[in-house]
Regions:
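Core AdoMet radical
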Residues: 1-45, 57-74, 86-105, 112-144, ...
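Amphipathic alpha-helical scaffolding segments
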Residues: 2, 78-82, 183
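Eukaryotic beta-rich interaction modules
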Residues: 44-48, 80
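Conserved acidic catalytic loop of the alpha/beta-hydrolase fold
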Residues: 49-56
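Distinct, well-ordered alpha-helical segments
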Residues: 75-81, 104-111, 174-176
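Short, acidic, metal-binding catalytic loop of nucleotide-sugar glycosyltransferases
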Residues: 82-88, 152
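Conserved C-terminal portion of the radical SAM core fold
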Residues: 116-120, 140-290
Length: 293
């Protein structure tokens, strides 16, 4: 069943009933099972189906939430507080997307009440390039928020620690630096399972899509990513999607109009934030933007 109320935040959850299944953690394998009850809901404080979720929270064994920023969304906070109030949070696997900047004391206290935590962290880049993409947030504050969570959340509760960047011309050269940073955290805090999963920009026609970069840049990126597929043993690295996409489009030669469209989109982006791409983007991207084809 689907419930859509302004698309504020979506919940994907599973119930366990004695007559249908044994308790088990949400997984891809579960989706193939005939007795698996799988539901998607959108939060609304006035929706009967949402209230039904809260009223029957004892039956929920796993929930996946996406946003908006979940840790600022009233529905997600309400769900966590209700589960804690009913003393059932310890039975729930909590999976959610977050930009990782809101790991404050109150939220960490909530997270420590849940049985299992799966973090899907929407972090698109690192250092100054991150600041460019996530203005006005700065990298030092993000790093402090992440470390605050990792220092205070019970490590036994953390099952998955996943970074989920979206690749574009803005950050393509910095994904490996971000991966190295995540590897450092996984090792430093002895986390159970790290995942680095890169998504493609959508829709594909967006002017900052990597398909519109020069053939030379695309080949360089393929080489960069392929060098890092198999060298990590303590983290799941998913770069094949990006590599395959680049290979599919590596022979596409961008037109002058493609270059101008990308430049225009980036400069409009800059004006809205009082920034300049020359200060943040990789030299190869800057050269591509400023060299007529």
């Amino acid at each position: 069943n689907d419930l859509n109320t302004e698309g504020v935040m979506g919940f994907d959850y599973r119930n366990d009933y004695p007559e249908t299944s044994k308790e088990r953690i949400l997984s891809c394998e579960d989706l193939d099972q005939p007795n698996y009850e799988h539901n998607v809901r959108f939060w609304s404080d006035s929706n009967n189906q949402w209230n039904n979720i809260l009223d029957n929270i004892e039956s929920i064994r796993a929930i996946k939430a996406t946003g908006g920023e979940t840790l600022l969304t009233a529905g997600f906070i309400e769900f966590m507080d209700r589960a804690i109030e009913r003393d059932v949070a310890k039975n729930i696997t909590l999976e959610f997307h977050t930009n990782a900047t809101k790991f404050n004391t109150a939220n960490i206290k909530r997270l420590n009440q849940f049985g299992t935590l799966n973090f899907n962290l929407s972090i698109d880049s690192i250092y100054e390039n991150y600041h460019y993409m996530r203005y006005p947030m700065v990298w030092s504050k993000l790093d402090a928020s992440l470390r605050n969570m990792l220092n205070k959340v019970d490590k036994n509760r953390i099952h998955t620690f996943s970074f989920n960047p979206v690749v574009s011309a803005l950050n393509a050269h910095y994904l490996i630096d971000l991966l190295d940073y995540q590897i450092g955290l996984v090792n430093e805090y002895q986390l159970n399972r790290g995942v680095f999963y890169v998504d493609l920009l959508w829709p594909e026609r967006k002017y900052t899509n990597i398909k519109f970069l020069s053939t030379g840049i695309k080949k360089d990126l393929i080489k960069l990513y392929e060098q890092h597929i198999d060298i990590y043993r303590n983290i799941g690295v998913q770069l094949y999607t990006v590599i395959d996409f680049l290979k599919l489009h590596q022979d596409y030669t961008p037109t002058e109009q493609d270059r101008l469209d990308m430049l225009r989109e980036i400069t409009l982006f800059d004006k809205s934030r009082n920034q300049c791409y020359n200060d943040y983007l990789h030299p190869d991207i800057i050269e591509f933007l400023e060299t007529p084809l």
